[in-house]
Amino acid sequence: MTNRVVLAYSGGLDTSVAIPYLSKMTDGEVVAVSIDLGQGGEDMESVRQRALACGAVEAIVVDAKDEFAEQYCLPAIKANGLYMKQYPLVSALSRPLIVKHLVETAKEHGGTHVAHGCTGKGNDQVRFEVGFADTAPDLKIIAPARDYAWTRDKAIAFAEEIDLPIEQSASSPFSIDQNVWGRAVETGFLEDLWNPPTKDLYAYTEEPSLGNAPDEVVISFEGGKPVAIDGRPVSVLEAIEEMNRRGGAQGVGRLDMVEDRLVGIKSREVYEAPGAMVLIRAHEALEDITVERELARYKRGIDARWSEEVYDGLWFAPLKRSLDAFIDSTQENVTGDIRLVLHEGRITVNGRRSEKSLYDFNLATYDTGDTFDQTLSRGFVELHGLSSKIACKRDREQ
């Protein structure tokens, strides 16, 4: 039986180089699968044609934009998904969806192997391979860029040597990954932590200091899901796309961070995620008024753990599924409207309303009509601090 390798194909350097290598290594055929996740830029048909030009026997494009938004980005909104309290999981969210479609393609097209173009330094090798092991353990996995020690400069030289149709060159050695949820840039001069990002590095966002007029927006949620913008019904994908445009025009969603990679190293990453950051901020603000205090406190820890599970490539794992169930159970009352102002790179919440709100004006007000019984406070304060008071007394006397 002929070996048939199903390759996750992005159209970039690593996976373009992988096609001729995989054909040679396995003495087989390569089926390239490209997933449209709303990354924009190059036409997906051009990507498909490039895969064929690089030697793939078949090249398949899957339009997964709505699926990505509804089944992967929406859970991230509900979980306020920010790894290390900053990174909105731009790449991490897309990997399990790519795994799913590669496995389906392998089943439909007689695939014996699956392959990716990830290096041995990154997180994506883990995300792909753990996903394959969880969902299709019989498929053999090949990672040519990692297992054959391809450095970026060697890959560029090889691509030029055999005239592979890719745009990357030694003078522009960035690694870029993007989808509708955001854009990630690494390597190149960014590896020196003292070098600031240059203006031409950004594509999803304008300079925050351009002086554009503030943009006020109202985002409506039902059960934690964004359902309308300024009163207009939208799908999750449409909400992300519109906030990408409007937030990006205001320079919202830029992030320059050093993150702790799963493989144990620290890596500098520059991200743009205007839609993700606006929707997560709005969702957090709505939870502030609709989720009870102790549940909200506990959920913050669950949100952080959920983000770590996704970042670590454990999308299909039992713990991740259980965290999903808990988070979904907290969203029943997360319904209402949040008004925000987007301006000069900032997201400012300035209005909140919900029929499910736990905010009681009569209890919160300091004016006439206050219904809060302050006579209860003295005893509450005494009991609340009693344990600490006793311990501190002991420590003073030692």
Swiss-Prot record:
HAMAP family: Arg_succ_synth_type1. It catalyses: L-citrulline + L-aspartate + ATP = 2-(N(omega)-L-arginino)succinate + AMP + diphosphate + H(+). It is an enzyme of class 6 (ligase). The gene is argG. It comes from the Bacteria. Belongs to the argininosuccinate synthase family. Type 1 subfamily. It comes from Corynebacterium kroppenstedtii (strain DSM 44385 / JCM 11950 / CIP 105744 / CCUG 35717). This is Argininosuccinate synthase. It holds the Pfam family Arginosuc_syn_C. The keyword Nucleotide-binding applies. The keyword Endoplasmic reticulum does not apply. One of its GO terms (cellular component) is cytoplasm. ATP binds at residues 8-16, 117. Homotetramer.
